[in-house]
Every structure is written in C-alpha cells, then in structure tokens.
C-alpha cells in the first residue's frame, strides 16, 4: 500500500488517499484546538498519543462486536482506516452533566444523569456545529430516520462497552463524541477517533480531568494527562 495525495486536513488529522481504493491513510497532528478553532496551540506528542489511544479503543470495540473503520497502525502517528463517507452528524453521549449540557440546562457539573443522554450536532464549522433534533435532521436531509436510529443505537452500544471498561481502569466516562461513516455498500461504521480530544475522562477517585478540558480551561499538564490515559489503557508511553 502506498500513500498518495492528501484529501483533507482537519483540526487534528490529515487524510490521504492510498493505492488501495477502499482504504485511507490517517496522520494525527500535534495541533490542539478548542471553541471551534478559536483557541489553538501545539502540544508535543499529542498526535502520537491520540493515534495510539484510538487504536486501543477501536481494536477493543471491534472485539466486542462494534465494527469500525480502524484497520491497523502504520507508525507512531499514522494509521490505516477503511474508506467511509462521513455522516455530517456528531453523536454525543452524556453520562454526567458537564460542558455545554451543564451550562445549557443549568445543571451542576458532575451531576450523574439518571440515564445516558444522546445529542446530535450538525457538523458545519461555519455554523459552529449546532445542536439539532430529529426534525432538523429530517428537514436538512442530513440522515434518514433509519440511519439516525442506527447512530443512536450504536452510540449507546459504545457507551455500554466503554463505561465498565474504563471503570476497571479508575476512569469515569463523563461524555464523548462519536462520528460515523458509510461504506460503499451502505454499511454504517464507527469512524474518526476516540481519544482525550473527543471524550471527557475523569479520574474515578479524584475527578482530575484527563482530557482536552485541561487545554480548554487552561488547567495545564495536557500532555501528562493524555500520557496517563494511554498508560491506564495498557499502552507504553514513548513520547
């Protein structure tokens, strides 16, 4: 397999075509962004940490029956994924009130929700990735009702696997963002990444934040928190 032209560059990754028609080459960057790109910085080693953390999560989820686009690691910062067309919806699953949910509904951060809350956000940087409901999704033609139901079901299935998996490692899964894509034959796969960039991870004992909130809120020690996550997931830290 050969790396070919760059297809896309986002806030955290570059995507390249490969010599195989059904696979892409993904390169993770050290760029850190928050607030829809308004806050930016470089965090040495972040690309490698997120690449390896994502590989661990996706491999584990595939073993537990949740199919995804991950194929294999290529290098410290690169991986091969199956080619999918990304559905322009971010699926957010929340177990504990934090971030925008706490602010929007006037809830105290850290409040345990009686059941997981699933939210959909329209992937559009120009609009600020707005929160949308089923009617919005239908009117905008973003996804069919059937696909929307599949995304919600898969999001909750991921949650059911991740919560106990992380609890065993003394990590509380507060909330997380998922993206999904369709293969050429219409199969919906979990895609993008699962990392401290896309999840809120708290230490189960101290509630110390082990995720991008350390960057968002200027808490410091961002790289150290990401390293701690990789270590607890059983990965070796080389950064």
Swiss-Prot record:
Reactions catalysed according to its record: 5-amino-1-(5-phospho-D-ribosyl)imidazole-4-carboxylate + L-aspartate + ATP = (2S)-2-[5-amino-1-(5-phospho-beta-D-ribosyl)imidazole-4-carboxamido]succinate + ADP + phosphate + 2 H(+)
GO molecular function, one term: ATP binding
Presence of the UniProt keyword Nucleus in the record: no
Alphabetical list of InterPro entries matching this protein: SAICAR_synt/ADE2_N (IPR028923), SAICAR_synt_PurC (IPR033934), SAICAR_synth (IPR001636), SAICAR_synthetase (IPR050089), SAICAR_synthetase_CS (IPR018236)
GO biological process, any: cobalamin biosynthetic process
Metabolic or biological pathway: Purine metabolism; IMP biosynthesis via de novo pathway; 5-amino-1-(5-phospho-D-ribosyl)imidazole-4-carboxamide from 5-amino-1-(5-phospho-D-ribosyl)imidazole-4-carboxylate: step 1/2
Keywords, comma-separated and alphabetical: ATP-binding, Ligase, Nucleotide-binding, Purine biosynthesis
Gene3D superfamilies given in the database record: ATP-grasp fold, B domain, Phosphorylase Kinase, domain 1
Cited SUPFAM superfamilies: SAICAR synthase-like
Annotated EC: 6.3.2.6
Record's keyword annotation contains 4Fe-4S: no
Record's signal peptide: none
CDD domains assigned: SAICAR_synt_PurC (cd01415)
PANTHER family documented for this protein: MULTIFUNCTIONAL PROTEIN ADE2, SI:DKEY-6E2.2
Family affiliation: Belongs to the SAICAR synthetase family.
Identification of the protein by name: Phosphoribosylaminoimidazole-succinocarboxamide synthase
Gene transcribed to yield this protein: purC
């Amino acid at each position: 397999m050969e790396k070919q032209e760059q297809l896309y560059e986002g806030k955290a990754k570059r995507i390249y075509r490969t010599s195989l028609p059904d696979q892409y080459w993904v390169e993770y960057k050290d760029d850190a962004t928050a607030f829809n790109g308004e806050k930016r910085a470089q965090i040495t080693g972040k690309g490698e940490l997120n690449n390896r953390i994502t590989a661990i999560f996706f491999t584990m989820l595939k073993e537990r029956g949740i199919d995804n686009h991950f194929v294999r690691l290529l290098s410290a910062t690169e991986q091969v994924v199956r080619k999918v067309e990304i559905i322009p919806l971010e699926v957010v699953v929340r177990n504990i009130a934090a971030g925008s949910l706490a602010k929007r509904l006037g809830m105290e951060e850290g409040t345990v929700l009686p059941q997981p809350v699933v939210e959909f956000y329209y992937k559009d940087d120009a609009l600020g990735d707005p929160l949308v409901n089923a009617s919005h999704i239908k009117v905008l033609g973003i996804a069919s009702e059937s696909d929307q139901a599949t995304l919600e079901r898969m999001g909750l299935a991921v949650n059911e696997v991740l919560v106990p998996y992380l609890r065993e490692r003394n990590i509380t899964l507060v909330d997380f963002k998922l993206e999904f894509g369709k293969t050429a034959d219409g199969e919906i796969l979990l895609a993008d990444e699962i990392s401290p960039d896309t999840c809120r991870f708290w230490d189960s004992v101290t509630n110390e934040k082990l995720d991008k909130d350390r960057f968002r809120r200027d808490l410091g020690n961002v790289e150290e928190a990401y390293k701690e996550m990789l270590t607890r997931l059983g990965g070796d830290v080389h950064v």
